[in-house]
């Protein structure tokens, strides 16, 4: 067919072979992108219809938008308002912000636990476990048979309802009454170590004034007779508690006086009490060392006993140098055999200075403390049958304590905690008091603010009975709780306690928690883990695992004390943290629990939101939908505008652009439009709590970091545990970051003073006087908000940036 000479003619018309498409309107960048898109589509394949003129705004296609994620209110919003393609219409800036907030689901993308929850539980004993720290039988032992005077023994039985000693008291009291050697007391928490060393001291001091049959002697000892015993404890709370116990014992001997000298109190008042006279002094190491240096009336020549309670904790807190100084000064003073009034002390009191060291653990730092303070000491334990090979081991928890751990993903930690507390207080009288241990003070503050009721408390009338009971020191640390109440317990009191609070606030809060008749929850740090004996504590929750195993033992020792039953719950993350239970020395197995069972039990009924919030829940909702709704509610609380904030910004999205059609540059906008947006204080507290939690997570002891690997933390998931939708920045600043911030603040204050000292000529919303920042970070928030506002104004007003291709 190639040789037949056939020719074919095609009519293509007068139109050009390639269609020329012109794009009009919009910005030049948008037109350039449209041309490139048309060129690409022409190269991919010809089309019978020319490409449509699609104008993109803010980097998004205005003709057809892709699928958008669903937001918190269940509707799909556009990222930016799409203007008309007319040239006269105002164009949206290229830096248009997204207005939708994305909230991820709680039950997706969670790591799976490696613990086998299907393993059948261990067979429970037919009879409940016998309490290991309970008092002995009254028929077998009593305090009088241990050598305590009949007056003291009768006082303990009738006034304090203590008729029988515990095991550690049985082994310690006779030894300290009849002997003068140093002693190291080692026993589990809640076993009565405090009375074990207090009773011999009180008995032998009372013997200076009373005969064995209780008849008075010719010489009577009083508060000016001399200082006979010094008791040191690591924390102020423990000193206060020892003082309370000792005052109860000394009611049978009112001529003897005890007092406390602790940090945070007035040194002038402490000196006045010492000057009046004291027989037993209870102190923290730092304040005692200060008084030994500066208080001349403090005479330690008559001191016969030096007690170091919770010695391991004192070494961990860095009191080694203070203890060396105190022990050295006491030993350097000559031992007086006769006091200033001529009362002979030898023969009744020890002929040498006796040092008693108390600890529930036998660690290297305790052994070092023993080398500093003890000489030829005897080792006294609760059970003499224990082998010496276990001396280095951590003492186990009481046998009647039931322990469990909840393996919950990071996303679900917060709602699981609320569900656990809600189920705990579901029945009246089941649990009276619960303690939640958290790793850092910032996290304690955040969880307290989050869980408390937001309804403002009405001030009591002058005639009401609550006016007399009201303590101004607890206004910021005690409140009614929300979320965790139930019809059986409509009132649950919430308390917080940590070391950053002032001493009067700490003491008042602890007293309020101890004396509370309603169900109560204490959110605290490790400051409450040592020695505190709060009555009716039935539940201990370790929301954050302890930094070391000994701290874990002391934490759970706040419950199941003196033979009472108790429960302890440990929160762990899936993964490496699950192996942490293998190193916990426990007399009872730690039972793992599924977080689903906690949520099902706690969220079986409607959650009671704070009084200022309304709920749309119904009884037909499932526990999973309630968990998601609760998490969403908590996140919305953080994102809500703070009280008194300016909410008129929605009327004019751009405060620097006048009303539509108004081009008069002389028109001044309202001053409220220049106010920078201030974040919700609860949101700032959540961010700070998250940062502090991450830093605290990295401080576990070296031997346990294999179970707490910070590199395996999912920061985005962990942010949900603080009701945050994304992890905040500024985690790794440390001291350098704070120093740099402080330097910037100082420079800004100097600049403001030079420019006018914060007078009336400053711009609204941008100037910041020196009084705006009171040291709590609020001024930094305002300064950062003003900086962001200035940057946004420059981006809007600077026309040259539109043509900056780079």
From Swiss-Prot:
Belongs to the DEAD box helicase family. DDX31/DBP7 subfamily. Residues 174-380 form the Helicase ATP-binding domain. PANTHER family: RNA HELICASE. Keywords: ATP-binding, Helicase, Hydrolase, Nucleotide-binding, Nucleus, Ribosome biogenesis, RNA-binding, rRNA processing. The gene is DBP7. The keyword Electron transport does not apply. It comes from Chaetomium globosum (strain ATCC 6205 / CBS 148.51 / DSM 1962 / NBRC 6347 / NRRL 1970) (Soil fungus). This is ATP-dependent RNA helicase DBP7. Residues 755-768 have a biased composition (Gly residues). It is found in: Nucleus, Nucleolus.
């Amino acid at each position: 067919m190639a040789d037949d000479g056939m020719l074919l003619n095609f009519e293509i018309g007068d139109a050009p072979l390639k269609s020329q498409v012109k794009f009009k309107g919009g910005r030049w960048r948008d037109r350039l992108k449209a041309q490139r898109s048309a060129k690409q589509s022409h190269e991919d394949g010809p089309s019978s219809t020319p490409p449509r003129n699609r104008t993109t705004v803010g980097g998004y296609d205005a003709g057809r938008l892709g699928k958008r994620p669903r937001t918190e209110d269940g509707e799909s919003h556009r990222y930016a308002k799409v203007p008309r393609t007319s040239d006269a219409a105002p164009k949206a800036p290229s830096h248009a912000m997204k207005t939708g907030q994305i909230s991820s689901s709680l039950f997706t993308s969670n790591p799976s636990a490696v613990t086998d929850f299907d393993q059948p539980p261990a067979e429970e004993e037919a009879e409940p476990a016998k309490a290991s720290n309970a008092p002995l039988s009254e028929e077998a032992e009593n305090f009088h048979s241990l050598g305590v005077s009949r007056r003291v023994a009768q006082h303990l039985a009738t006034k304090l309802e203590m008729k029988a000693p515990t095991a550690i008291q049985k082994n310690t009291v006779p030894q300290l009454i009849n002997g003068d050697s140093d002693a190291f007391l080692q026993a589990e928490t809640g076993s009565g170590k405090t009375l074990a060393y207090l009773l011999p001291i009180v008995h032998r001091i009372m013997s200076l004034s009373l005969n064995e049959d209780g008849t008075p002697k010719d010489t009577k000892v009083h508060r000016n007779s001399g200082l006979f015993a010094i008791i040191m404890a690591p924390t102020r709370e423990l000193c206060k508690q020892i003082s309370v116990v000792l005052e109860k014992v000394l009611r049978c001997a009112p001529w003897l006086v005890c007092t406390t000298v602790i940090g945070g109190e007035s040194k002038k008042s402490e000196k006045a009490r010492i000057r009046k006279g004291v027989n037993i002094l209870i102190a923290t190491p730092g304040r005692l060392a200060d008084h030994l240096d500066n208080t001349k009336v403090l005479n330690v020549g008559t001191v016969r006993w030096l007690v170091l309670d919770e010695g391991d904790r004192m070494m961990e807190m860095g009191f080694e140098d203070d203890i060396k100084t105190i022990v050295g000064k006491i030993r350097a003073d000559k031992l007086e055999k006769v006091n200033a009034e001529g009362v002979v002390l030898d023969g009744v009191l020890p002929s040498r200075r006796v040092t008693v060291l108390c600890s529930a653990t036998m660690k290297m730092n305790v052994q070092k403390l023993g080398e500093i303070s003890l000489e030829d000491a005897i080792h006294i334990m609760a059970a003499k049958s224990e082998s010496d090979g276990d001396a280095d081991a951590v003492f186990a928890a009481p046998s009647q304590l039931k322990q469990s751990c909840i393996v919950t993903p990071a996303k679900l930690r917060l709602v699981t905690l609320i569900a656990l507390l809600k189920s705990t207080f579901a029945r009246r009288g089941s649990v009276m008091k619960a303690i939640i241990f958290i790793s850092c003070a910032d996290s304690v503050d955040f969880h307290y603010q989050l869980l408390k009721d937001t309804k403002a408390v009405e001030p009591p009338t002058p005639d009401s009975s609550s006016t007399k009971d009201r303590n101004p020191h607890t206004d910021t640390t005690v409140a009614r709780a929300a979320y965790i109440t139930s019809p059986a317990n409509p009132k649950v009191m919430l308390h917080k306690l940590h070391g950053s609070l002032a001493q009067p606030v700490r003491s008042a809060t602890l007293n309020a928690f101890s004396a509370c008749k309603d169900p109560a929850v204490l959110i605290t740090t490790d400051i409450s883990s040592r020695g505190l004996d709060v009555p009716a504590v039935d539940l201990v929750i370790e929301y954050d695992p302890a930094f070391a195993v000994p701290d874990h033992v002391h934490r759970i020792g706040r419950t199941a004390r003196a033979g009472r039953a108790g429960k302890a719950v440990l929160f762990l993350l899936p993964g490496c943290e699950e192996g942490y239970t293998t190193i916990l020395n426990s007399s009872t197995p730690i039972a793992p629990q599924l977080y689903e069972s906690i949520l099902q039990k706690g969220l079986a009924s409607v959650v009671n939101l704070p009084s200022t919030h309304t709920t749309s829940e119904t009884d037909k909702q499932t526990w999973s939908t309630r968990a998601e709704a609760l998490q969403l509610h908590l996140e919305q609380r953080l994102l809500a505008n703070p009280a008194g904030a300016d909410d008129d910004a929605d009327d004019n999205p751009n405060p620097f652009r006048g009303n539509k059609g108004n081009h008069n540059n002389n028109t001044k906008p309202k001053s409220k439009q220049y106010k920078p947006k201030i974040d919700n204080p609860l949101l700032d507290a959540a961010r700070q709590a998250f940062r502090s939690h991450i830093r605290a997570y990295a401080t576990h002891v070296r031997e346990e970091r294999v179970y707490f690997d910070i590199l395996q933390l999912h920061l985005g998931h962990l942010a949900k545990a603080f009701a945050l939708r994304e992890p905040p920045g500024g985690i790794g600043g440390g001291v350098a970051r704070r120093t740099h911030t402080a330097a910037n603040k100082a420079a800004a204050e100097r600049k403001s003073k030079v420019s006018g000292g914060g007078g009336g000529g400053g711009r609204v919303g941008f100037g910041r006087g020196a009084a705006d920042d009171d040291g709590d970070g609020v001024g930094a928030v305002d300064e950062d908000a003003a900086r962001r506002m200035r940057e946004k104004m420059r981006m809007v007003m600077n026309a040259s940036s539109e043509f900056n291709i780079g």
